[in-house]
């Protein structure tokens, strides 16, 4: 027996930018397809016209490509099972709507929104979960036709609802969650499969598309579990075999323990935001893959090829995945340390230009200086935009020392170390990082001060910071004139504070 050809899909709605949760769904489907040498389909689910954002699908596709996720069939690539936009498949859906109506498995419903809300209010008052009740109960076929003709005459537009069989169990063996089942009376009554404007509902269109596109596995978020029994109703009504379903766990905020919500402003949640900050796509790919999936062993840094080789949906977690910002920053820092220097330079240059610190067209000499600046900060950066704050001293006039910095250098040796270091700088032949370090060592010999009491006063006096890159490299980039100005300003402030 031939092995089943794996076909998966990622089916976003063009309602805005690419969210972390949606990126994870796309990524896991991509890894599953590539691991099994299967096919990845991109389908745009744009039937909800009110929520669609202009350019939304283009933005999402660009960000998927940036992450390193590609697909084999889709609106931009074509394929044997298109169109790949739901808005272009209306005639296809209508064919199956008509079939279900002809077979008596679906029907036109003319109940108005006001009537439906009144029904729900009545059910709530009775302590019953709101659900749709069949509006033609006890009526003959002729009576139903008469009621529908009268509704048409009033100009009412119908929806189409699908019959839900009574006392039936809908179940599936979920790839992630194991065996799940729902009773038909918990679905909420006959549900809408076509809206008043003629567009299909999500739970109908997705079944038609997945079947006709020969999708074998559906990996999606936990929030779709409640949609699955409705989709199984449609599969059963059409006599089709459903695909295998896998529902990935929620992503939660590691700080609050609550579900990651688009309203949670404590966490950046869109891929574009991380791109703008200077995160690397390989790092984002790595981090997102670990949100609800675990590789074998202790290592957490893998390239795409290694992830594809290892990916097994059996290792998808049943517990919520914690979005840990600090872990993301650590992972991105690991990639920054290994990144191509030109790539880092381009990202950091863009950040510096957006901050107004560097001209749009820097000279070759300035570019070389910026390259060195990026190199000395790369080991510290969690993302390249951090260089804007880290390296402010290189672009702005020196400010007075903070109370914390003054506290650090007001020891008995602080002033003496700074004054001696200034003398030693005048003795070095060239203002290079090597010669600067020689001046620091000469200061140590002359003062007898070493360790933190030696290095911290020098760092604070010259770079106006208690942390930073190698002190020699930093001073070389600042240049001797500015370093001496900083030292003089520090000594002046110390005198004013009687230090």
From Swiss-Prot:
Which ranges belong to the motif 'KMSKS' region? 259-263
Q: One GO term of the cellular component aspect?
A: cytosol
Q: Which InterPro entries match?
A: aa-tRNA-synth_I_cd-bd, aa-tRNA-synth_I_codon-bd_sub2, aa-tRNA-synth_I_CS, aa_tRNA-synth_I_cd-bd_sf, Glu-tRNA-ligase_bac/mito, Glu/Gln-tRNA-synth, Glu/Gln-tRNA-synth_Ib_cat-dom, GluQ/Sye
Which residues are listed for ATP binding in this entry?
Answer: 262
Any idea which UniProt keywords this protein has? Aminoacyl-tRNA synthetase, ATP-binding, Cytoplasm, Ligase, Nucleotide-binding, Protein biosynthesis
The EC code for this enzyme is: 6.1.1.17
- What subcellular compartments does it reside in? Cytoplasm
Keyword check for Transcription regulation, yes or no.
Answer: no
Which GO biological process categories is it annotated with?
glutamyl-tRNA aminoacylation
Per the record, what are the reactions this protein catalyses? Answer: tRNA(Glu) + L-glutamate + ATP = L-glutamyl-tRNA(Glu) + AMP + diphosphate
Any Pfam family the entry gives = tRNA-synt_1c
Q: Does the keyword Ribosomal protein apply?
A: no
UniProt lists the family membership as follows: Belongs to the class-I aminoacyl-tRNA synthetase family. Glutamate--tRNA ligase type 1 subfamily.
Which PANTHER family does this UniProt record tie to the protein?
GLUTAMATE--TRNA LIGASE, GLUTAMATE--TRNA LIGASE, MITOCHONDRIAL-RELATED
The protein's role, per its UniProt record:
Catalyzes the attachment of glutamate to tRNA(Glu) in a two-step reaction: glutamate is first activated by ATP to form Glu-AMP and then transferred to the acceptor end of tRNA(Glu).
Assembly and interactions? Answer: Monomer.
Q: What is this protein called?
A: Glutamate--tRNA ligase
**From which source organism is this entry?**
Lactobacillus helveticus (strain DPC 4571)
Q: What is the lineage of its organism?
A: Bacteria, Bacillati, Bacillota, Bacilli, Lactobacillales
């Amino acid at each position: 027996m031939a092995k089943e050809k794996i076909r998966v899909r990622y089916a976003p709605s063009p309602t805005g930018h690419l969210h972390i949760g949606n990126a994870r769904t796309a990524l896991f489907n991509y890894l599953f397809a590539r691991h099994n040498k299967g096919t990845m389909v991109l389908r745009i689910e744009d039937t909800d016209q009110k929520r669609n954002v202009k350019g939304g699908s283009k933005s999402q596709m660009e960000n998927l490509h940036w992450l390193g996720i590609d697909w084999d069939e889709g609106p931009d690539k074509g394929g044997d099972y298109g169109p790949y936009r739901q808005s272009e498949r209306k005639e296809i859906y209508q064919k199956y709507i008509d079939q279900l109506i002809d077979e008596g498995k679906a029907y036109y419903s003319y109940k108005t929104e006001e009537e439906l809300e009144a029904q729900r209010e009545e059910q709530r008052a009775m302590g019953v979960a709101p659900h749709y009740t069949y509006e033609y109960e006890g009526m003959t076929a002729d009576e139903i036709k008469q009621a529908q003709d009268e509704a048409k005459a009033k100009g009412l537009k119908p929806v189409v609802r699908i019959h839900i069989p009574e006392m039936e169990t809908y179940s599936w063996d979920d790839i992630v969650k194991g065996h799940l089942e729902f009773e038909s009376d918990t679905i909420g009554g006959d549900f809408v499969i076509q809206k008043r404007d003629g567009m299909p509902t999500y739970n109908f269109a997705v079944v038609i598309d997945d079947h006709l596109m020969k999708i074998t596995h559906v990996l999606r978020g936990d929030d779709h579990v409640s949609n699955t029994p409705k989709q199984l109703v449609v599969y059963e009504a059409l006599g089709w075999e459903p695909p295998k379903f896998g529902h990935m766990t929620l992503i939660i905020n590691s700080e609050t323990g609550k579900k990651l919500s688009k309203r949670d402003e404590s966490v950046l949640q869109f891929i574009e935001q991380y791109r703008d900050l200077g995160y690397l796509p390989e790092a984002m790919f790595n981090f997102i893959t670990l949100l609800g999936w675990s590789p074998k062993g202790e290592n957490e840094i893998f390239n795409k090829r290694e992830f594809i080789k290892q990916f097994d949906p059996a290792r998808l977690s049943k517990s919520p995945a914690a979005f840990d910002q600090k872990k993301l920053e650590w992972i991105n820092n690991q990639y920054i340390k290994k990144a191509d220097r030109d790539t880092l330079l381009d990202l950091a240059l863009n950040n510096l230009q957006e901050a107004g610190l560097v001209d749009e067209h820097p000279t070759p000499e300035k570019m070389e200086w910026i390259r060195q600046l990026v190199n000395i900060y790369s080991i510290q950066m969690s993302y390249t935009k951090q260089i804007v704050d880290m390296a402010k001293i290189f672009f702005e006039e020196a400010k007075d020392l903070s109370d914390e910095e003054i506290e650090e250098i007001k020891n008995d040796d602080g002033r003496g170390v700074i004054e001696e270091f200034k003398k030693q700088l005048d003795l070095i032949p060239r203002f290079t990082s090597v010669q600067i370090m020689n001046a620091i060592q000469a200061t140590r010999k002359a003062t007898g001060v070493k360790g933190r009491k030696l290095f911290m006063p020098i760092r604070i006096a010259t770079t106006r910071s208690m942390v930073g890159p190698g002190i020699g490299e930093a001073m070389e980039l600042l240049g001797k004139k500015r370093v001496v100005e900083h030292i003089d300003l520090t000594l002046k402030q110390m005198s004013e504070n009687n230090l």
